[in-house]
Each structure stands twice: as structure tokens, then as C-alpha cells.
Amino acid sequence: MLYRAIIWDLDDDPDGNVRHCAEHGVTQEEVEEVLENAQDVDLSRSSGRPVAFGDTAAGRHLMVVFEEIDDDTVYPVTAYEVPRRQRP
């Protein structure tokens, strides 16, 4: 997937995506790695949003839940580490 823009909320926004990812131990950089090099994209069964699966440079397997704003822009909602066999 190639997106030209990834929208991040302010770091100190308690309801923002930066903080939500951080609560799961995932950094913005890791989310961007997965979105730029996703191994699989599917739909979440719980939210219906698109999810991207991929590995970080550190070897973590992450699931990133996101919203497509347009063809070039995404808004990551949350992200967390998942076992490789888990599906949305």
C-alpha cells in the first residue's frame, strides 16, 4: 500500500490515535512501517474498518486498523501486536 499522507492526532490528545497506539505499545513509526509494507489487508469483523497486517523492522507482527480518507490518505485508528495466525 502506498499512501502519501498518514494523519496523526497531537501526541497529547487523550482520544487521539497516537496515544491509542501507544497504549498498545506501538509507535507511530511502527504503524507507518506496516502501512507502507503491508503483507495483507482485510476488513475487521468487529468494526468493518480496513486492517493491515505486517512486520516491523524489529520483527513485531502488527495489525493496524485504519480509515481511508481518500486514495492517498489514511487515518490510523489503532494498532497492536497480534499472533501471526490471528485474523480480523
Feature-to-residue mapping (PLM):
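Ribonuclease/tRNase effector modules and their secretory precursors
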Residues: 1-88
